[in-house]
């Protein structure tokens, strides 16, 4: 037999007082070396541990400083006892484990430890789900992080994930286990929102690897330096001899609009999201979090579904001692962040405040989108109102069917039929329509009636049934069932119909059946001032204009025509229009300085719901304010 060759294994050393720097000598995060390497690591040797007895004695004296350069990569090793991961630097001869940082590197090392523990918990959760065979969604990951890290709320866990999102994506994308992570619901959720960041990470890693290859080639072949210099010289000569390109003047670009607050780069929810299709995801700041806490404190859980944006503005205005208009500007400037927070909360998404903020920041809901959101909200409503701790809507359906449907008790029968309506809508297809015939057919089958008998008895409890409809459920007018129900109420009970509020006046839908990907500026009002045209004084300020909506909805838009006293036209030099209302910081950038933008008129109509004072009061301005106050009184 041939003699067994003793292979040389790596020795393991531990380093204390670690400090990591880049080429410029600046302190950097070691776990960014995959993108921005190479780095240099310095420290003091603490102890050593042999993997296998080496053939030659290459031990290093302990207690001496050591420098490892260049560092191109690192390894993470699980530490199950502490529920975290440790960092190891691997060289061709040795492995170096990091024990402790130096005093100047302590702050960065604490962030590294926080990232490693966060990734360990996410990886362990995904591994356990793979073993059990059930992959849970993103919300379950957030709950696990909240419990393991002992955070006060799930929102803090979401903030922690967003804080270290680049590191998490690097670990999931840059390693060879991308095909495994692609099945994780956690990775699918963050990948759809951070695609631009993934592209940037891959580009940086590719550039770092190319630089590493070049450094290896230059170190292995020092004689090739002359050839590289010749090639670079030839490239320079070819660039010099290129034909001269003709000079052209590009078209002037539009003036960029300045935001109220500094936001991050636009990130978007996936298009199949039923609540916020195409809305940006922004990092919350201190002001947005404080506004959210004020909203939570000022509203009780019973009234979460019914509170409106105007009521929230009045409450915040009283707390901060500002006007309602300033409170509305604050809420709308942080509208995307508030929607993101409410989207993660179970009881807030789909509420009236949720939809009001969507309309305030210019988000339009299509009919299909409204139906999907409404069905999801009905399902959530039944989930929250299940009895006996049962968390299935099927249990509620069984209790409804087992109850005797006595039409002599109109109020009880109306409640049972209304809850069955919510169950029937919530269990249907997301974007499909729901008709009156479907409700009669399904209800008759569920409660063991014929369709004729059930419809006759249903008409008797129709007034009590209609009273249960509320705008808090969102987009009732998105279904043809609501229009058919109002027509039946108008024919059978005209007096009740005259006193019943029409929810079409309070809901704004985009009837184009398109899913908008970008946040567009609101060019129309999200409500309908019904008594506006009856005022003779308001006819000179407002004009009626029919839109492309269906005639059965009765939705109209109202726009200001001209108000010369308010200087509607922007500045000719800058193209910027600033609002003349005192303490209002709103401004608009118009592409055509000779033509006022529609956004200006919409902003002026926003002052109708607040008390305001113009900067330069005159007789014409006073007459205009009186008209607006008169309009406001009739709208309310």
From Swiss-Prot:
Plastid keyword on record: no
Cell location: Cytoplasm; Mitochondrion; Nucleus; Chromosome
Alphabetized UniProt keyword annotations: Chromatin regulator, Chromosome, Cytoplasm, Mitochondrion, Nucleus, Transcription, Transcription regulation
InterPro entries, per database record: Cytosine_MeTrfase1_RFD
Transmembrane regions listed in the UniProt entry: none
GO cellular component: CLRC complex; cytoplasm; heterochromatin island; mating-type region heterochromatin; mitochondrion; nucleus; pericentric heterochromatin; rDNA heterochromatin
GO BP field: CENP-A containing chromatin assembly; silent mating-type cassette heterochromatin formation; siRNA-mediated pericentric heterochromatin formation; subtelomeric heterochromatin formation
Highest taxon, organism lineage: Eukaryota
Binding partners and assembly: Component of the Clr4 methyltransferase complex (ClrC) composed of at least clr4, rik1, pcu4, rbx1, raf1 and raf2. The cullin pcu4, rik1, raf1, raf2 and the ring-box protein rbx1 are components of an E3 ubiquitin ligase, whose activity is essential for heterochromatin assembly. Interacts with pcu4.
Function description: Component of the Clr4 methyltransferase complex (ClrC) which contributes to the establishment of heterochromatin by specifically methylating histone H3 to form H3K9me. ClrC preferentially ubiquitylates H3K14 and ClrC-mediated H3 ubiquitination promotes clr4 methyltransferase activity for the methylation of H3K9. H3K9me represents a specific tag for epigenetic transcriptional repression by recruiting swi6/HP1 to methylated histones which leads to transcriptional silencing within centromeric heterochromatin, telomeric regions and at the silent mating-type loci.
Protein name in the entry: Rik1-associated factor 2
Gene it is expressed from: raf2
